[in-house]
UniProtKB/Swiss-Prot annotation:
PANTHER family: RNA M5U METHYLTRANSFERASE (PTHR11061), TRNA (URACIL(54)-C(5))-METHYLTRANSFERASE (PTHR11061:SF30). It is an enzyme of class 2 (transferase). This is 23S rRNA (uracil(747)-C(5))-methyltransferase RlmC. NCBIfam families: meth_trns_rumB. The gene is rlmC. InterPro entries: 23SrRNA_MeTrfase_RlmC, MeTrfase_TrmA_AS, MeTrfase_TrmA_CS, SAM-dependent_MTases_sf, U5_MeTrfase_fam. SUPFAM superfamilies: S-adenosyl-L-methionine-dependent methyltransferases. Keywords: 4Fe-4S, Iron, Iron-sulfur, Metal-binding, Methyltransferase, rRNA processing, S-adenosyl-L-methionine, Transferase. Its EC number is 2.1.1.189. GO terms for molecular function: 4 iron, 4 sulfur cluster binding; iron ion binding; rRNA (uridine-C5-)-methyltransferase activity. PROSITE patterns: SAM_MT_RNA_M5U (PS51687), TRMA_1 (PS01230), TRMA_2 (PS01231). It catalyses: uridine(747) in 23S rRNA + S-adenosyl-L-methionine = 5-methyluridine(747) in 23S rRNA + S-adenosyl-L-homocysteine + H(+).
Length: 376
C-alpha cells in the first residue's frame, strides 16, 4: 500500500507498510505458531485477509489547529499535529465528510482543544460508516457542554450538506488526559443507532458500543464461528464478552438456548434489537460482568464462546471454565499472547482448530479464532 503520509515521515502507525500482504501474513502466522508452541493443534486453517486499503469503517480524529483552520488527525509526542484526512486506510466516502466538517467547526464556533494550554472545547471527531447502507455516525467529543447550544443551532446546515449522517452525538470528556470519550453522551438526532448487516444478520452500532473496524474480515470471522458451531452438537451456548452480539447472533438457531453477556449496556441494547428483528426468542442478552456471570451459574452449557479484550479472560474465568467443563470452548482473541496463556490454564482442553484473521493490515496485530474440545 502506498501512503504519502508514511513516505513523508509524518505517520508511522502502519509499521509494516513496506512489507507485502503475503509477507505480513507469513510473519503473523509464524508468531501464532510460536505462541502456541507445545500445545497440540489438530488443524491449522488457512489465514483470512481482506483489502489492504480503504477497509476501515471508523476514524478517530484528534482535532487541533484553530477554529478557522482545524486539523483532523493525531498529535506527535512533542505536540506537533498531523492531518490524517488523506489516510489510505479510510474509504473514499470519508473525504467529503472531513472537508465539510472543517468549515462547519468555524460555523459552530467549536474551538479545538489545545492540550498545552488546556483550553478549547472540541477534542475529537469520531466517525463510523455502515457498510450496509452507507449511513454514518458522527460524535463530537467536547470538553464541556458550553458550546452545545451553538452546535445544535449549526446542525441543520451540516445535515443538509451530509444527509448520510444518521446519528450525531456530543460526548462530554472533561478530563485533561488522552482519553477518547467520557461517560455522558448527548444525542443530537432522533436516530440513536446505526444499522449494519453482516451475512444477512442485522447488527446495530451505538455510540458507546464496541464494533470491529474491519467489516470485510469481521464478517468472515463471524461466519466462520457460525460454521464451526453448526458442525457441533450444541443446544445451549454462552457468548461471553459478546459486544453487540455479532457471534451469538450468527451462531444462534431457533432451537438453541443462547445467553450473551457484555458489561456495556449500550452494546447489549444493540444485541437485543438484533435478536428481536431475527425473532430469536431463546436468545437472551444481559449487561453484566462476564466472569461474575459465569461463576454465579449452576448450569453447564454445551459451548462457551469468549471474545475478551486484549487482556484475555484471565485465570479466575479459566479456572471456572475448567471446573464447569463445557464440552467445547471457542476463543476469539485480538491478542494471541494472552489467549495462549489462557489456554494453558485449561489443561483438560485440546485445540481442534485455529484460524488467523488479518483484521489489522500493516501492523503486527491480528485476530485469531480457536476451537477447544474437552479431552476428558
Amino acid at each position: 500500500m502506498q501512503c504519502a503520509l508514511y513516505d513523508a515521515g509524518r505517520c508511522r502507525s502502519c509499521q509494516w507498510i513496506t512489507q507485502s500482504v503475503n509477507e505480513q501474513l507469513s510473519a503473523k502466522t509464524a508468531d501464532l505458531h510460536r505462541l502456541l508452541a507445545g500445545l497440540p493443534v489438530e488443524q491449522w486453517c488457512a489465514p483470512i485477509s481482506g483489502p489492504e486499503q480503504h477497509f476501515r469503517n471508523k476514524a478517530k480524529m484528534v482535532v487541533s489547529g484553530s477554529v478557522e483552520k482545524p486539523l483532523f488527525g493525531m498529535l506527535h509526542r512533542d505536540g506537533t499535529p498531523v492531518d490524517l484526512c488523506a489516510c489510505p486506510l479510510y474509504p473514499a466516502s470519508f473525504a467529503p465528510v472531513f472537508s465539510t466538517l472543517k468549515p462547519f467547526i468555524a460555523r459552530a464556533g467549536l474551538t479545538p482543544y489545545n492540550v498545552a494550554r488546556k483550553r478549547g472545547e472540541l477534542k475529537y471527531l469520531l466517525l463510523t460508516e455502515s457498510q450496509f447502507d452507507g449511513g454514518m455516525m458522527l460524535r463530537f467529543v467536547l470538553r464541556s457542554e458550553t458550546k452545545l447550544t451553538q452546535l445544535r443551532a449549526a446542525l441543520p446546515w451540516l445535515r443538509a450538506q451530509l444527509p448520510q449522517l444518521r446519528v450525531i452525538t456530543a460526548n462530554i470528556q472533561p478530563v485533561h488526559m488522552a482519553i477518547m470519550e467520557g461517560e455522558t453522551e448527548i444525542y443530537l438526532t432522533d436516530q440513536q443507532a446505526l444499522a449494519e448487516r453482516f451475512n444477512d444478520v442485522p447488527l446495530w452500532i451505538r455510540p458507546q458500543s464496541f464494533f470491529q473496524t474491519n467489516p470485510t474480515v469481521a464478517s468472515r470471522l463471524y461466519a466462520t464461528a457460525r460454521d464451526w458451531v453448526g458442525q457441533l452438537p450444541v443446544r445451549h451456548m454462552w457468548d461471553l464478552f459478546c459486544g453487540v452480539g455479532g457471534f451469538g447472533l450468527h451462531c444462534a438457531t431457533p432451537q438453541m438456548q443462547l445467553t450473551g453477556i457484555e458489561i456495556a449496556p449500550e452494546a447489549i441494547a444493540c444485541a437485543k434489537q438484533s435478536a428481536a428483528e431475527l425473532g430469536l426468542t431463546r436468545l437472551h442478552f444481559q449487561a453484566l460482568d462476564s466472569t461474575q456471570f459465569a461463576i454465579a451459574q449452576g448450569e453447564t452449557p454445551d459451548l462457551v464462546l469468549v471474545n475478551p479484550p486484549r487482556r484475555g479472560i484471565g485465570k479466575p474465568l479459566c479456572d471456572y471454565l475448567a471446573q464447569m467443563a463445557p464440552r467445547f470452548i471457542i476463543y476469539s482473541s485480538c491478542n494471541a499472547q494472552t489467549m495462549a496463556q489462557d489456554i494453558r490454564h485449561l489443561p483438560n482442553y485440546r485445540i481442534q482448530r485455529v484460524q488467523l484473521f488479518d483484521m489489522f493490515p500493516h501492523t503486527a496485530h491480528y485476530e485469531v479464532l480457536t476451537l477447544l474440545r474437552r479431552s476428558i
